[in-house]
Amino acid sequence: MLPLPPAVTALSAPGKVLLTGGYLVLDRSYTGTVFALDARIHVIVQQLRRNHRREAASGSAHGRSDTPQAEGNVHGDKEDEGTIVVHSPQFVDAVWEYSIQRCEDGGGVLVKQRNDGPRNLFVETSLNFALTYISYVADSKDFGSLSITILADNDYYSETAFSKASGLRSSSRFVDFGVRLQEAHKTGLGSSAALVTALVSSLVIHRTMQPDDLGPGRDKLHNLAQAAHCAAQGKVGSGFDVAAAIYGSCLYRRFSPSILESVGDAGSPGFEERLFRIVEDADPQHPWDTECLDFGMKLPRGMQMVLCDVECGSQTPSMVRKVLEWRKQNQKEADMLWGALQSNNERLRLELRRLAQSPDEHTLSDFENVRTYIQRSRNHIRSMTQKSDVPIEPRVQTELLDALSELEGVIGGVVPGAGGYDAIVLLIQDNPDVITRLKAFFETWESKAEDDFGGKIGKVRLLGVRHGSEGVKNEMLEQYAGWV
């Protein structure tokens, strides 16, 4: 019999930046170099019913607390019925209350939103998938009532006047954005994948594992998060963002899409058995074939990665569809271009790895090959932009990247991932003077280019996020004081 869960479980998962391999990672023939970031999405799960709480233990551990929590039922729910309340306190009215429903014919578990307001599809789908898996593995019919708090490090969203003032008033790592979630502008760091990963992982750890099981259970959590994330976003995407959220920085080759094609919709007959087989990698016809190499890879000493928010996000799924349509209609031309891009990306990765393996602190002159490979990648990407008629590196971004590349200490930069008008990523010399120069540049920068897709760059802001190597991890509860 599985142990009763503790009162509180806390985990976080990182955002990502796909330095190379945008669009290519959609095809298993190609790879992408993805870096985890130090900006993370945090999920804190609290068990609210006495009969689901472990007896108080001495001391506390990473990610867990046995401190007694609220007693009784949540919001007057019936004794035999669990309630889940999800709260994102950094945003206005960001509360979702769900009842838990068990489906017939092995359909698993579905949550149904009780309160008014817009749905949160990523939260809802994550709950459906995680609770279905947990109930099947644990053979449990009673989850009790749960309170789930979601917190995002500040760089996931563009700064607002309210959040700026909030940050000045508080020493907390989290700020109050002062807007509704649907009004907040994302900076393109992979918040949905980090959210899904942290949410399903925290629930599975909370109900079926110990925090120390996080490492050995990472592959199963990866499979569950991929299934939930694909379902929530309409099965568009390669999964590199979830892989980075689970494993951290790595060289990524996507899984075969057929692995998830059989899972079906949550609640459909037999869903819980199909999901179990996918998570446990128990389908001999469709084994998981994701490749994640160079786990925890780091940048060379003397190099740093920074991101800049251009306050004009892209609609990734529609851009992906258009690029894939172009490739289908121009297969030979596209394959030649993608082959050249893959070859250059691999040279860049190997050069970064070679430099990172050296114990020496590198100077700017050591990074000339990196600068050359970045420029070549951009040349190929601009060619794909023109041929596909999709703004992967639109003219206003070219103007910005070219100007930044001329600054002393800047090695080079790209529009990462799917491209467009999202955050840009720069590789720079790890020197405070370079950061000072970048901030001064953005104070006076004004785009003068006439964009080929009608896009506009407003204010450009240097984000505080830096590269990191860790994936999903347990967290200490003290940092959430005042928020949970």
Curated annotation (Swiss-Prot):
Residues 54-77 are annotated as: Disordered. It catalyses: (R)-5-phosphomevalonate + ATP = (R)-5-diphosphomevalonate + ADP. One of its GO terms (molecular function) is phosphomevalonate kinase activity. ATP binds at residues 184-194. Transmembrane segments: none annotated. Pfam families: GHMP_kinases_C, GHMP_kinases_N. SUPFAM superfamilies: GHMP Kinase, C-terminal domain, Ribosomal protein S5 domain 2-like. Pathway: Isoprenoid biosynthesis; isopentenyl diphosphate biosynthesis via mevalonate pathway; isopentenyl diphosphate from (R)-mevalonate: step 2/3. One of its GO terms (cellular component) is peroxisome. GO terms for biological process: ergosterol biosynthetic process; farnesyl diphosphate biosynthetic process, mevalonate pathway; isopentenyl diphosphate biosynthetic process, mevalonate pathway. Keywords: ATP-binding, Kinase, Lipid biosynthesis, Lipid metabolism, Nucleotide-binding, Steroid biosynthesis, Steroid metabolism, Sterol biosynthesis, Sterol metabolism, Transferase. Its EC number is 2.7.4.2. Belongs to the GHMP kinase family. Mevalonate kinase subfamily. Phosphomevalonate kinase; part of the second module of ergosterol biosynthesis pathway that includes the middle steps of the pathway. Erg8 converts 5-phosphomevalonate to 5-diphosphomevalonate. The second module is carried out in the vacuole and involves the formation of farnesyl diphosphate, which is also an important intermediate in the biosynthesis of ubiquinone, dolichol, heme and prenylated proteins. Activity by the mevalonate kinase erg12 (AFUA_4G07780) first converts mevalonate into 5-phosphomevalonate. This is Phosphomevalonate kinase erg8. It comes from Aspergillus fumigatus (strain ATCC MYA-4609 / CBS 101355 / FGSC A1100 / Af293) (Neosartorya fumigata). The lineage of its organism: Eukaryota, Fungi, Dikarya, Ascomycota, Pezizomycotina. The gene is erg8.
